């Protein structure tokens, strides 16, 4: 990757398995770019998951090529696909300012 000018990548929905693959490349001396993972959360994310994220973050703390120090929280969708919750209806398409299933990603009291 570095030989093509790609020096860093980031996955906003990284997984432990994916991080382990990059770690294997690092151990074999074949990782030629920086990799940053952000773990996604959901309504079923629990304390054990958060503890796992913390252990993994600490494992790679100070590593110059591998990072896993971010967690992605979803509120709704994105404007481009008309899944973001809006105050007013979309002017060009979509459903009346709601996500695809008509709800926020999580129940409002959890935000």
Predicted segment positions?
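Metal-coordinating catalytic core of metallo-dependent amide/deamination hydrolases
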Residues: 15-111
């Amino acid at each position: 990757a570095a030989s093509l000018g790609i020096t860093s990548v980031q996955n906003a929905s990284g997984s432990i398995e994916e991080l382990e693959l990059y770690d294997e490349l690092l151990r074999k001396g074949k990782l030629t770019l920086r990799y940053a993972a952000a773990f996604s959360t959901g309504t079923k994310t629990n304390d054990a998951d958060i503890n796992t994220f913390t252990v993994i973050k600490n494992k790679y703390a100070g590593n110059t090529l591998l990072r896993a120090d971010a967690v992605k929280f979803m509120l709704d969708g994105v404007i481009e696909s008309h899944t973001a919750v809006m105050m007013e209806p979309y002017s060009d398409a979509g459903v009346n300012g709601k996500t695809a299933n008509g709800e926020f990603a999580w129940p409002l009291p959890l935000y």
